[in-house]
Amino acid sequence: MIQPNLSGSANGHARSYYAASAGSLPGYPSLEGQPSADVCVIGGGFTGVNTAIELARRGLSVILLEARRIGWGASGRNGGQLIRGIGHEVTGFARYVGQEGVKYLEQAGIDSVEVVRQRISEHAIDCDLRWGFCELANTPAQFAAFQAEQDSLVRLGYRHPTRLVAPQDMQQVVASSVYAGGLVDMGLSLIHISEPTRP
């Protein structure tokens, strides 16, 4: 487990557990002159870094610009959840994008986790990775939605184990009995968010 040095500086990042426990981060040169590249990616968060990697793999020359530090913005300030989805129930978007659009959003969420999983593996990134995540239901209606979510994952061919947790069993999973149930997904994780954007 990565141990924080909470008395130290935030390495040029916003103060957080992740910045305090990241150790020293390398500096990068400022842009000078008039460099030329096939593509200029602006923003060094997870999306920008991944875009630059993918383009370079396809043989394009890439310049990656970041105003502060790699991983400084939203990518360096989240809670470290490596989870599928967009923070909302995607079924609510059906009236805008139709059922095929909802299916696409669900698959995109799954694929995004797989991309990060591949990057962590191929670059041997030490990010305190621990597979297994439990979504928590505050109401019986949310727990029922988890049941529908699990069914949807099966239809999408999701390859990781999932398990519904009944309300009476939540104490065993999260040491609390206040929740109305949960959905454990072994394909999701928490990560140390400062590490995946290191060189």
Predicted feature descriptions by range:
Residues 79-84:
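Short, surface-exposed loop/turn segments at secondary-structure boundaries that line and modulate
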Residues 1-39:
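Extreme N-terminal leader/targeting segments of oxidoreductases
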Residues 189-198:
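Residue-level detector of conserved catalytic or cofactor/ligand-binding positions
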Residues 168-177:
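Flexible hinge/switch segments at interdomain interfaces of large molecular machines
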Residues 37-64:
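N-terminal Rossmann-like FAD-binding beta1-loop-alpha1 element of flavoenzymes
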